[in-house]
């Protein structure tokens, strides 16, 4: 079956920006992740397709090669197999020029393949992001089959020479005037075939397992930051292990919104406090703090508490807490309260220029508009 177009897989246009590609991949990865769709092979296949497409389109060089040469520009094998990730452009097309200029080629590549880097999305609270902490995660990994030790063959048997490529790992294909050598679609470059599959892994050489890891979260991490766990990624065919990248996502906070090192919050105050001034108590990540409200404070006024934000990663100075005032209109008034407010309104109307200059100015503009 022919591979799907990577842009179609991610649902983006061919001129999509890096951010659009990243956003689309995140959405698909969350939707089709195997942990969210257990025992659903279609979802797992969609997840793999999205991951493969993103690995190419998020890399500038691979994307350029794909745009010019299609799938052959990034992965000549064009099919699933023990080789994960993608070779570079020179690997994919180096043999073409050897054929043209008499280099021949045809030697099988080394069988030591690297696996793929893994990604894990982790949600943490704003409080955990602000201070250094440690947590545990449980991740699915593809591990070498202990029964066949990664060969994919039934114990007591050995893989046999691939009948398609004769053990070379590559096949020659004619494309117009060019003779192109591509990775063998049958053995995926190994030069070997499994005649009797291992009963434990069905010939894949790997089995799905789960492992628990401890993740140290540095103080000041922000949305999208990555924590690298070296050697905790995939290991394929005895090759060196890749890495696991834990991607930080911040949970929505009930009070604060983060903007780099600064924190923002709404600060409702009564209209009497706004008019007369006073002192209120506000929450911070370190506890509570006192703030003085000057008389005649209006909705939209912002007060800054220096140093009460978050100290961003790799910086020494913490940000500030920005408190945005919202003057609250009283509700469910008693008759006595209504009476006092009407009395106050009568007094205000006697000198509205002084007591409500913005309202007076606005009404004057309205009158001028309709004249």
UniProtKB/Swiss-Prot annotation:
GO molecular function: ATP binding; heat shock protein binding; unfolded protein binding; zinc ion binding
Highest rank taxon of the organism: Bacteria
Pfam families in UniProt: DnaJ (PF00226), DnaJ_C (PF01556), DnaJ_CXXCXGXG (PF00684)
Positions of the UniProt region annotated as Disordered: 31-52
Residue span(s) of domain J: 5-70
Ranges: CXXCXGXG motif repeats: 145-152, 162-169, 184-191, 198-205
Primary localisation category: cytoplasm
Cofactors named for this entry: Zn(2+)
Keyword Repeat among UniProt keywords: yes
Keywords per UniProt: Chaperone, Cytoplasm, DNA replication, Metal-binding, Repeat, Stress response, Zinc, Zinc-finger
Function, in words: Participates actively in the response to hyperosmotic and heat shock by preventing the aggregation of stress-denatured proteins and by disaggregating proteins, also in an autonomous, DnaK-independent fashion. Unfolded proteins bind initially to DnaJ; upon interaction with the DnaJ-bound protein, DnaK hydrolyzes its bound ATP, resulting in the formation of a stable complex. GrpE releases ADP from DnaK; ATP binding to DnaK triggers the release of the substrate protein, thus completing the reaction cycle.
Domain topic, free-text comment: The J domain is necessary and sufficient to stimulate DnaK ATPase activity. Zinc center 1 plays an important role in the autonomous, DnaK-independent chaperone activity of DnaJ. Zinc center 2 is essential for interaction with DnaK and for DnaJ activity.
Subunit structure: Homodimer.
Name of the featured protein: Chaperone protein DnaJ
Upper lineage: Bacteria, Pseudomonadati, Pseudomonadota, Betaproteobacteria, Nitrosomonadales
């Amino acid at each position: 079956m022919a591979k799907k177009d990577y842009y179609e897989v991610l649902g983006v246009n061919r001129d999509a920006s890096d951010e659009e590609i990243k956003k689309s991949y995140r959405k698909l990865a969350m939707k089709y992740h195997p942990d969210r769709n257990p025992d659903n092979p279609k979802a797992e296949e969609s997840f793999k397709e999205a991951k493969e497409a993103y690995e190419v389109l998020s890399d500038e060089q691979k994307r350029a090669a794909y745009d010019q040469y299609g799938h052959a520009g990034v992965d000549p094998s064009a099919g699933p197999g023990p080789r994960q990730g993608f070779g570079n452009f020179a690997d994919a097309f180096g043999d073409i020029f050897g054929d043209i200029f008499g280099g021949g080629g045809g030697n099988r590549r080394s069988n030591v393949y690297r696996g793929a880097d893994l990604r894990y999305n982790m949600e943490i609270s704003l409080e955990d992001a602000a201070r250094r902490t440690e947590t545990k995660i449980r991740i699915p990994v593809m591990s070498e089959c202990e029964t066949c030790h990664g060969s994919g063959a039934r114990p007591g048997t050995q893989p046999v020479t691939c009948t398609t490529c004769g053990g070379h790992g590559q096949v020659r294909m004619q494309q117009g005037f060019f003779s192109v050598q591509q990775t063998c679609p049958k053995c995926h470059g190994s030069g070997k075939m499994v005649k009797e599959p291992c009963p434990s892994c069905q010939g894949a050489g790997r089995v799905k397992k789960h492992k628990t890891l401890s993740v140290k979260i540095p103080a000041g991490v922000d949305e999208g930051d990555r924590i690298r766990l070296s050697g905790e990624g995939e290991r394929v065919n005895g090759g060196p292990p890749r890495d696991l990248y834990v991607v930080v996502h911040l949970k929505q906070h009930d009070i604060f919104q983060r903007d780099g090192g600064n924190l923002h919050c709404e600060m409702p105050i009564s209209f009497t406090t706004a008019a007369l001034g006073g002192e209120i108590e506000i929450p911070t990540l370190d506890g509570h703090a006192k703030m003085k409200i000057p008389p005649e404070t209006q909705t939209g006024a912002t007060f800054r508490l220096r140093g009460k934000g978050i100290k961003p990663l790799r910086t020494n100075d913490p940000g500030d807490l920005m408190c945005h005032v919202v003057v609250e209109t009283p509700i469910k008034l008693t008759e006595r309260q209504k009476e006092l407010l009407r009395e106050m309104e009568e007094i205000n109307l006697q000198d509205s220029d002084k007591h409500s200059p913005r309202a007076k100015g606005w009404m004057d503009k309205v009158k001028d508009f309709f004249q």
